[in-house]
């Protein structure tokens, strides 16, 4: 009697529940696309009905999917809920998909989180991949190049980027010295992000950018509200019910995007009031020059109200990626002082202390460049590209891939693939140097994946590389970074669209020589 009272369901109810469960499972299985004769579907590990592999991914999808690839190969399929997701690993396979078959894999999945970014009109996240998208991407690329890496004949600097970074790096050094004279330590991320956002802000908006405003600082110091939800594999994109349940992370994501969009719209509007098409001095001016009023545009013109979508991608990616790269670099340097000393010896030998580093010094500083490459590889702080999708039925490595299939590209796996890298878990910049140590091993450097490949490759890749190089060269020429004895620095990546390290508020900076 006691046993029967402890059972909450009758045998009939349990049988009915099991039948419904099996019915749903087989219905979902029947929805899978038919595979043409002679082809096969990618291998798929066992997953839970209804849930798929979401429990397997957990907090570190890049690690879980890397382990799966070791067993199932470079092309495999998982399910998040009932949605099939193609997972690509291996440099050759990824290059085949994104470069050689780039038109097949250039799409973006229509994810819920993407609809919340600039009202679903983001150039980077939008599922659109047609001629209009291509034209706007080309326009954004040209505007970015013109006012960043192109030469400025009226300046003593080689380009706009060099001018802005040089000035902001000096300002950062001054701020760090003030902090050392006060509390005696600092959180590098909070300091670096201010300088980096001022650089991209100056290039985008010129004198109209509100440097160090409370609104701007509040946004850029809280990017975690964006990256934790925009990351690949977020359940909210695959389980619609989660959008209607209490979800603090999703609410923060929505609020951040709304605040960021308001900030950009206000700044764009203020800039437009003073726009002179005969005197274009920043990225916004270049975009205005190729815009027209009204909801529709033709040829190379775009509607003015769409400009904010382009500048959102340029501005947003321009500060978060570079800030994260520099912050990771400083964390490696304080935990590996011998590497820091090698970089500074190279700077002292090749540049000296009588002038500041410039972008033209890059060929003379191979060890610094190798260190940056190893930081990109080892941290892999962009573990996945933004998800891709197929634009048509296709095949890859003999497997059938249907149209509109969501695709995860595992950059972390490539950067830690033992078939590509000797001792991939070790941080070793020398791996990127030629035998005599005087130059970068170019074929090996091209195996590092951080900015994607093919038609969706990041348009700011060159800018980001140059900016990280110049910031670090100027900082390390003048400062020595360290942490006090006994302070533990946690280098465990925190998963997100861009993976951050745990915040460290105990970093110190000492002047290496008197600044003239």
Curated annotation (Swiss-Prot):
GO terms for biological process: arachidonate metabolic process; cholesterol metabolic process; estrogen metabolic process; hormone biosynthetic process; progesterone metabolic process; retinol metabolic process. Pfam families: p450. It comes from the Eukaryota. Its cofactor is heme. Pathway: Cofactor metabolism; retinol metabolism; Steroid metabolism; cholesterol metabolism; Lipid metabolism; arachidonate metabolism. Interacts with PGRMC1; the interaction requires PGRMC1 homodimerization. This is Cytochrome P450 1A2. The lineage of its organism: Eukaryota, Metazoa, Chordata, Craniata, Vertebrata.
């Amino acid at each position: 009697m006691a046993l029967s009272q402890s059972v909450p369901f009758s045998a009939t109810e349990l049988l009915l529940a099991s039948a419904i469960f099996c019915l749903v499972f087989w219905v979902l299985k029947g929805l899978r696309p038919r595979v043409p004769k002679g082809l096969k579907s990618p291998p798929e590990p066992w997953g839970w009905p209804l849930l798929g592999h979401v429990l397997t991914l957990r907090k570190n999808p890049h690690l879980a999917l890397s382990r799966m690839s070791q067993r199932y190969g470079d092309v495999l399929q998982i399910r998040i809920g009932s949605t099939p997701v193609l997972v690509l690993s291996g440099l050759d396979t990824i290059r085949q998909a994104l470069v050689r078959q780039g038109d097949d894999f250039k799409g973006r999945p229509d994810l819920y989180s993407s609809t919340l970014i600039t009202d679903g009109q983001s150039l980077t996240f939008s599922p659109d991949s047609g001629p209009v998208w291509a034209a706007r991407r080309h326009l954004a690329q040209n505007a970015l190049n013109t006012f960043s890496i192109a030469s400025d004949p009226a300046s003593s600097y080689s380009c706009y980027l060099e001018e802005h970074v040089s000035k902001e790096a000096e300002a950062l050094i001054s701020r760090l010295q003030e902090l050392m004279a006060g509390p005696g330590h600092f959180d590098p991320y909070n300091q670096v992000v201010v300088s980096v956002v001022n650089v991209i802000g100056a290039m985008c908006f010129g004198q109209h950018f509100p440097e160090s405003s409370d609104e701007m600082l509040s946004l850029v110091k809280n990017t975690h509200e964006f990256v934790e939800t925009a990351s690949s594999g977020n359940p909210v994109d695959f389980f619609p019910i989660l959008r209607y349940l209490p979800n603090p992370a999703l609410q923060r994501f929505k609020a951040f995007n709304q605040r960021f969009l308001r900030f950009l719209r206000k700044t764009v509007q203020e800039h437009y009031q003073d726009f002179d098409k005969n005197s274009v001095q920043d990225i916004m001016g270049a975009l205005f020059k190729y815009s027209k009023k009204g909801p529709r545009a033709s040829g190379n013109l775009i509607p003015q109200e769409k400009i904010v979508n382009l500048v959102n991608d340029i501005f947003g990616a321009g500060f978060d990626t570079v800030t994260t790269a520099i912050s990771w670099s400083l964390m490696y340097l304080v935990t590996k002082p011998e590497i820091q000393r090698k970089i500074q010896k190279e700077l002292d030998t090749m540049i000296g202390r009588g002038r500041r580093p410039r972008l033209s010094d890059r060929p003379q500083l191979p060890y610094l460049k190798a260190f940056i490459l190893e930081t990109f590889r080892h941290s892999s702080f962009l573990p996945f590209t933004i998800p891709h999708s197929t634009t048509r039925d296709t095949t890859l490595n003999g497997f059938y891939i249907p149209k509109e299939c969501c695709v995860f590209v595992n950059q972390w796996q490539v950067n830690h693939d033992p078939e590509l890298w000797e001792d991939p878990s070790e941080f070793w910049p020398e791996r990127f140097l030629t035998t005599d140590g005087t130059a970068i091993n170019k074929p090996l450097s091209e195996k590092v994946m951080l900015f994607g490949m093919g038609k969706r490759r990041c348009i700011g890749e060159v800018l980001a590389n140059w900016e990280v190089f110049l910031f670090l060269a100027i900082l390390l020429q003048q400062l020595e970074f360290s942490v006090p004895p006994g302070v533990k620095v946690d280098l465990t990546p925190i998963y997100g669209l861009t993976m951050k390290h745990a915040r460290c508020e105990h970093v110190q900076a000492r002047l290496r020589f008197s600044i003239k």
